[in-house]
Swiss-Prot record:
Biased composition (Polar residues): 36-49
Protein's organism: Burkholderia vietnamiensis (strain G4 / LMG 22486)
Name recorded for this polypeptide: Large ribosomal subunit protein uL2
Region of interest (Disordered), residue spans: 36-59, 224-275
Protein purpose: One of the primary rRNA binding proteins. Required for association of the 30S and 50S subunits to form the 70S ribosome, for tRNA binding and peptide bond formation. It has been suggested to have peptidyltransferase activity; this is somewhat controversial. Makes several contacts with the 16S rRNA in the 70S ribosome.
Ribosomal protein in keyword set: yes
Complex and partners: Part of the 50S ribosomal subunit. Forms a bridge to the 30S subunit in the 70S ribosome.
Sample GO molecular function, one term: rRNA binding
Name of the gene encoding the protein in the UniProt record: rplB
Annotated Basic residues bias: 50-59
SUPFAM superfamilies named in the record: Nucleic acid-binding proteins, Translation proteins SH3-like domain
Tagged with keyword Nucleotidyltransferase: no
Length: 275
């Protein structure tokens, strides 16, 4: 993997920094593990914008990634590493001994030809998936389930990981990259190691068009709008917001807590804000 600073042939390319990985597969993805996805452009079923700054972008297929890793006791061989346009992490195509192929999140250090295993008897090695009750305390893990059998939901982005801190009864404590310490049931599964493609954060977009390719539209400041469009809008000439920062709907922003799910609050041992 190499970090390439592009030759400044234009203003848009002058600041561009790319992450090039020669080990990724250059051909087409595995057709049996593709699915179609339509662009919603941030609209719901009523046609109203529910997520701003989305729209356009290049069409791409969804890669069906195995987040459950339930083929216990069946060894798998890594056939190739691939780019996935739907996520920051790379994915790996693995071939199981029974002939089935699946995509998984590629952990750091994974190589073509490497053997992987899942289940309670799997060795403690990067890329193997085990129930948390079988993972030693202090191990770095990723792709962590929040409910047994639901599939991995935490620590799935490029370069992320978590650490298994302790086990108490039927729960284990996991420290996430944000600093939050969370309780997880010991029957939940996790994968050993950290997610690969950690250089993803070092890339520089370089020009606005590169974000448009990704389906990201411009973000307009509230003070540049009219009063009808944003609480910060209006005024003669350049003016400040005139109030504490708020969202377009008047909710305080920059540190204001909006978490409303009280049902799972007991699973958070220490918040990431440490207040």
């Amino acid at each position: 993997m190499a970090i390439v600073k592009v030759k400044p042939t234009s203003p848009g390319r002058r600041a561009m920094v790319k992450v090039v990985n020669k080990d990724l597969h250059q051909g087409k993805p595995h057709a049996a593990l593709l699915d179609t996805q339509s662009s919603t452009a941030g609209r719901n079923n009523n046609g109203r914008i529910t997520t701003r700054h989305k729209g356009g972008g290049h069409k791409h297929h969804y890669r069906i990634v195995d987040f459950r890793r339930t083929k216990d006791g069946i060894p798998a061989k890594v056939e190739r590493l691939e780019y996935d346009p739907n996520r920051s992490a790379n994915i790996a195509l693995v071939l199981y001994a029974d002939g089935e192929r699946r995509y998984i999140i590629a952990p750091k250090g994974l190589t073509v030809g490497q053997q992987l295993m899942s289940g309670s008897e799997a060795p403690i090695r990067a890329g193997n998936t085990l129930p948390i009750r079988n993972i030693p305390v202090g191990t770095t893990i990723h792709c962590i389930e929040m409910l047994p059998g639901k599939g991995a939901q935490m620590a799935r982005s490029a370069g992320t990981s978590a650490m298994l801190l302790a086990r108490e009864g039927v729960y284990a404590q996991v420290r996430l990259r944000s600093g939050e310490i969370r309780r997880v049931h010991i029957e939940c599964r996790a994968t050993i190691g950290e997610v690969g493609n950690e250089e993803h954060s070092l890339r520089q977009i370089g020009k606005a068009g590169a974000n448009r390719w990704r389906g990201i539209r411009p973000t307009v400041r509230g003070v540049a709008m009219n009063p009808v469009d944003h609480p910060h809008g209006g005024g003669e000439g350049k003016t400040a917001a005139g109030r504490d920062p708020v969202s377009p709907w008047g909710t305080p922003t920059k540190g204001y807590r909006t978490r409303s799910n009280k049902r799972t609050t007991t699973m958070i041992v220490q918040r990431r804000h440490k207040r």
